[in-house]
Amino acid sequence: MVGGYRIGMHFLASALRFLEPRVDDDFVDRLHYLYTSTLVLMFAVLVSAKQYVGHPIECFVPAQFTRAMEQYTENYCWVQNTYWIPFQDLIPHRLDDRERRQIGYYQWVPFVLAVAALMFHIPSSVWRMLSSQSGLNAALVLQLACQEQNVDPLVRNKTIDVLARHIDDALMYQREHGARKKNIYIFAVVRVGKFYGAYVSTVYVFIKTLHLCNVIIQFLLLNSFLETAEYPLFGAHVLYDLLLGREWRDSGKFPRVTLCDFEIRVLGNVHRHTVQCVLVVNMLTEKIFIFLWIWLSVLGLITALNLLFWLCALASAHCRQNFVAKHLDMESDQIGRFTDRFLRPDGVFLLQMIASHAGNLTCAKVTEALWLIFLRRSGKPVLDEKVESSDRGEWESNDDAARKESLPRRESWHEPPLPPPMPQLPIRSHYV
């Protein structure tokens, strides 16, 4: 008994772990897989409680019906669907005319909402599966960049050094082994010429596209599920009805009062009854679907703009170079080569994520550390670009700088100690 309880709690904890926010994404991604998914799942639980715990349908039956017959009528009408006829219209005599007016979606509302919540989470699961295939651990990099211990300057400097080394090793791994690891690019379609350094960034843009496609599919499913194909903009039409003063009696989208036909055998004879029923659950369902339609409209617009932003930021070489130059705060003819040959799109993507989560200061420090690695590997003097003077001027005054000049000089990550003289070896360029 105790073992089964532990197993159940383990599976529950594993399921809830998927609802935890990740660090290797942005706010728009969390709008999809965390906030929207959780909200739709709550709606599914709410409607389920109303249907299976409360009384979703109440029928007006003849006076001679007993309580058991009334319960049978309500259960039958709930399972076999009801149909809606405007009060000013006559009830059709033909049974097939009545069947064409049946409303059969309200029983499936909780299941449809649960599937919708799952669909909002699928792109995030695909991102988790594909983002770790390149050796560039974006989640680990952002966790280190965002840790609270970085408020200590010593810890921050050590963290920046670790981040720069990890990013450099991962980018070098991509340059050296990317051509031999072509199978990891099949799922994300990232064969962008000879630049295998665009794997993570291309997968991320692909996930953004999945989010946008999911919102569009949700619109199509909403109209198909509610059988409102003649109104492509379902929520807009319902709101238009409400603005004109047309309530549910006229529109028929979520009718509260419906009709139900059923037959009863009495002494070998079949008696047909037509009763009038109240679908209380439709009042709740109407509000949920109108809210979802409006929310999907806003979410689709936000996702489209966000996708356009990331496409420009990662696909445009000019945008990538401007981003790197802004955080280096310098002008150099080597920035283009540093961005396109050393960092490449994946490195710029990581720096943009660091700037978004840990702030521009941390991003500038990491960019500068990578710049120093690039200069050393290129065989250029490390201090010929005056990196330290432009950065220190933002956080310390001239008096502090003069006072520090009078103190014994300490090593820092800006000025690495010079190694003892060694024979000059040929320098191998990994990014040319």
List the predicted regions and their residue ranges.
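Membrane-embedded alpha-helical segments and the immediately adjacent membrane-proximal loops
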Residues: M1-D400, E405-P408, H414-Y431
